[in-house]
């Protein structure tokens, strides 16, 4: 019996592979547990179509991330904060503040994507890493000024 594996099965194969198994093992274990599906032409074609659609979506998402990277790297965000002596900020710049400032420039992303190497506690120019996903990282320029 030929089956299409719906998940990785140790000692048999990886998800998406078509493997030959004994009828009892295929019917009573793999198919019964939802680990595989009988490999008919219809099932194989449906699976391949799903794979193509997933690849197209991933490519589209990657293109959007590349565009977002270009937008982020072309920006210089200016944040105005209250300062004390020696241009020291009251508090520090947070990821949330950076995310909100980015939204003003029509760049919407979650604060968890922003990485601040060291706490920003004084005025000046800084660079912050933004991890967009799929290995795409952008460098955002920050300018912190006194209010």
Curated annotation (Swiss-Prot):
PROSITE patterns: RIBOSOMAL_L9. GO terms for molecular function: rRNA binding; structural constituent of ribosome. GO terms for cellular component: ribonucleoprotein complex; ribosome. Signal peptide: none annotated. The keyword Ribosomal protein applies. The keyword Oxidoreductase does not apply. Coiled coil: none annotated. One of its GO terms (biological process) is translation. Keywords: Ribonucleoprotein, Ribosomal protein, RNA-binding, rRNA-binding. Belongs to the bacterial ribosomal protein bL9 family. Binds to the 23S rRNA. HAMAP family: Ribosomal_bL9 (MF_00503). This is Large ribosomal subunit protein bL9. It comes from Helicobacter hepaticus (strain ATCC 51449 / 3B1). The lineage of its organism: Bacteria, Pseudomonadati, Campylobacterota, Epsilonproteobacteria, Campylobacterales. The gene is rplI.
């Amino acid at each position: 019996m030929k089956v299409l594996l719906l998940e990785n099965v140790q000692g048999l194969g990886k998800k998406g592979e078509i493997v030959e198994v004994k009828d009892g093992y295929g019917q009573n274990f793999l198919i019964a547990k939802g680990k595989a599906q009988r490999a008919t032409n219809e099932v194989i074609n449906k699976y391949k179509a799903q794979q193509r659609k997933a690849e197209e979506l991933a490519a589209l998402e990657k293109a959007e991330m590349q565009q977002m990277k270009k937008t982020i790297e072309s920006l210089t965000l200016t944040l105005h904060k209250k300062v004390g002596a020696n241009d020291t900020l009251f508090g520090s710049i947070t990821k949330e503040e950076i995310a909100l400032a980015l939204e003003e420039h029509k760049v919407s992303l979650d604060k968890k994507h922003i990485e601040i190497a060291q706490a920003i506690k004084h005025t000046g120019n800084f660079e912050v890493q933004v991890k967009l996903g799929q290995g795409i990282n952008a460098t955002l320029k920050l300018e912190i000024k006194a209010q």
